Amino acid sequence: MKKVGFDNDKYLKLQSEHIRERIAKFGGKLYLEFGGKLFDDYHASRVLPGFKPDSKLQMLLQLKDDAEVVIAINSGDIEKNKIRGDLGITYDTDVLRLIAAFRGVGLYVGSVVLTQYAGQQTADHFAKRLEGIGIKVYKHHHVEGYPSNLQQILSEEGFGRNDYIETTRKLVIVTAPGPGSGKMATCLSQLYKDHQRGDVAGYAKFETFPIWNIPLKHPVNIAYEAATADLNDVNMIDPFHLDAYGVKAVNYNRDVEIFPVLNAMFERIFGESPYKSPTDMGVNMAGNCIVDDAVVCDASNQEIIRRYYQALCNDRQGRESKEEIYKLELLMNKVEITTADRKVVAAALSKADATGEPAAAIEFPDGEIITGKTSELLGASSAMLINALKKLAGIPDEALLISPEVIEPIQKLKTEHLGNRNPRLHTDEVLIALSICAVTNPTVQKAMNELHNLSGCEVHSSVILSHIDENVFKKLGINLTCEPKYQENKFYQN
């Protein structure tokens, strides 16, 4: 039974209601800067067990009749083919993906705004492509002195040069394929233009983390710092909120640093600022929906350890700086955890020591741990996967789900025809073999029926795994960590 620490239904209700209240506060028009992942927020679902990866999307669907989406993309990012690291696609391709995804669930995409536009040919080509599929395109220019030179920004030579984005709904969700796309500047430009036109509108910011109304050193907030260790974001007590209300609220350094500028900008536009602190600008209600703090703390601690192992492996592969590792070690010290608090680590390493070969271990939600060892036929991860499925299905450990007669021809194909040096079956190959065997073997089918129960389980490998195995675990929803070393000093896995 998976432990739940977050009430997702309560969140959907509270969050949508709170956004409606903010729309009403500003007379019926709100530009909502939407940070983080709108689709597939797996970080939130890991640290807040019970939070669904698509919760934010489901929440917005409750507002869809009043909402429209504006997607911002930096023209410079189009020019240099900037890649979204988690998906491996360019930012402009991701804009098309987002449009299709939003439309697919019934959200209205009003337009795309090309920010930092300076006549880039690639941006012009992209604009034509968007217009060809019926999407309105607007252009916002670089503003000299942004964000500190208010006189320049709030003038016809600043925001005045930007296109006014025509919107028709009460809630305008401004999102982007990644950071640095100009979401905030887009919102502020619209506020300036609306004010010039005599229209009333407001601004708010949606960020799930850090959670403002739980302690600064709460593991959920520390896990956010761990997730953004490469950005050097630091959680802090919002000094403006403390000064205005005498209440401690958590925010992060960039929002606190920019607030005096935003505040002055709001005063210039509205006559007085509607907000007394950066926390006031937010609409996040996630902290009100934590129902079991112990479960959430444990899940967040595990996330911090996972981030640490990921950084160690990235460093081993030459993709990480030592500073990020040091920061993660400091964060672990803050919440008083070590790698020993991840139980599967000791189990995997113990099995590896006993066999002298790579090993892997998986922990089920009830705390039970199953291991897998390397054999002539299977890699450790594949063996562990089979053992885990057998355990979940109540199949005796000695039962063979895939006979050697099935595995050996696959190995022959791999080594003699496909050029692989490693004959052992990867996890994807094992799953395909199991699927074929399940057609004629009800016992194997029984094991395959348990695949969905692997989601949320914890796995540790005594060596760095191949990208193939990593991707299989990711698709199964398994939380993987690896020791930062290769099998027998093999720097490339195939």
Predicted ranges, named:
Residues 1-173, 190-351, 357, 364-366, ...:
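Flexible phosphate-sensing "switch/lid" loops adjacent to ATP/NTP-binding sites
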Residues 175-177:
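Residues at the beta-strand->loop junction immediately N-terminal to the Walker
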Residues 179-181:
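Walker A (P-loop) phosphate-binding loop of P-loop NTPases
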Residues 186:
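Hydrophobic positions on the alpha1 helix immediately C-terminal to the Walker A/P-loop
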Residues 202, 374-376:
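Residue-level structural signal for beta-strand termini and adjacent loop
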Residues 369-370:
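Hydrophobic "anchor" residues
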Residues 377-393:
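A short, polar/charged loop-to-alpha-helix boundary motif
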Residues 391-423:
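Short HxH-centered metal-ligating active-site micro-motif
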